Each structure stands twice: as structure tokens, then as C-alpha cells.
Amino acid sequence: MENLARFLSTTLKQLRQQRGWSLSRLAEATGVSKAMLGQIERNESSPTVATLWKIATGLNVPFSTFISPPQSATPSVYDPQQQAMVITSLFPYDPQLCFEHFSIQMASGAISESTPHEKGVIEHVVVIDGQLDLCVDGEWQTLNCGEGVRFAADVTHIYRNGGEQTVHFHSLIHYPRS
């Protein structure tokens, strides 16, 4: 987990510097405070999954950019604030196919709000085990084991486990071609 945190902080700093951006400019683009971004870059703070999505969206890079070190076969992100969500990259972003694929586990009672992705992003969610409540653009639906949905992910979407057991689901995210 420590290697992942170091990888995340290094990657964030490299992406910011490649663009020639200050922390203030990065804060404007992501909606994350300059102080928090600085703490993440210095590896003094671990971002929540929601914060990491904001950063990825603001930088216009796939989420897996931050959790897929080249030498790691199964990188995971654990949400330290919720202490209830684990995201594992099954297939990191593929620039030729323009998608990434995650396995996600959420403990009972966990909730995660995802900010809108860039225009044209499509997300597929399939429940592997348990029951998932999903809200897309204000409309809630419940998905049971074996059920799935595809939606435009350029709107706010919320994942919630209202059940008594951990829910396990896959998220396949398609990005528009550049």
C-alpha cells in the first residue's frame, strides 16, 4: 500500500509538471484544494476515491493512471476515509481500446459519489455478488447479482451498498477516442 501511495504522489506531480501547471492551476482544473494537492504530492495525505476521480477528470487522464504501477499485477485503492471500498484494476487503461476495467468491493453501508467524467465516457456496471444501489443523474436503481447497466458517465453517479453484506461489482469505463 505504501508503494501505491508513493506511486500516486509521484504520478500526480509528474502530470502537473508535464503540463507546466502550478498547484493553483491544478486546483482550478480539479476542484481539489491546493493544500490537499500539495499534501498528496508530498505523500503526506491519501486521497479518497472521490478525490482521486476529481483529479483524474481534471487532468483528463484515466483513473487507473494513478493506481497501476507498471510492475504491479493487481493494484488496489483502499478508501481510507470510508474504510469500506476497495478498487482493483483488472485491466489498466488501454489507449488503443480506450477503456479500463475495475473490480470494486464495498462494505455494507458504504457510499461513493463519482463526479461527472468527461463528455462521451460510458460506464458499464455488473454486480458479481450482493446488491448495489446506483444513482445516475438523480435516478436510483437497484442491481442484484448478475445484473448490469450501461450509462453515460458524464453526469454525477453514486454507488451505495444498502445491503447487509459486501457488494462486489465490476466497472468497465470506455473513454471517447481523442
Curated annotation (Swiss-Prot):
Residues 105-171 form the Cupin type-2 domain. Keywords: Activator, DNA-binding, Repressor, Transcription, Transcription regulation. One of its GO terms (biological process) is negative regulation of DNA-templated transcription. SUPFAM superfamilies: lambda repressor-like DNA-binding domains, RmlC-like cupins. Induction: Negatively autoregulated. The keyword Transcription applies. Residues 23-42 bind DNA. InterPro entries: Bact_TransReg_Diox, Cro/C1-type_HTH, Cupin_2, Lambda_DNA-bd_dom_sf, RmlC-like_jellyroll, RmlC_Cupin_sf. One of its GO terms (molecular function) is DNA binding. It holds the Pfam family Cupin_2. Regulates the expression of 12-16 transcription units involved in various steps of sulfur utilization. Represses expression of pfkB, fliZ, cysE, ydcO and its own expression. Activates expression of ypfN. Acts by binding to SutR boxes. This is HTH-type transcriptional regulator SutR. It comes from Escherichia coli (strain K12).
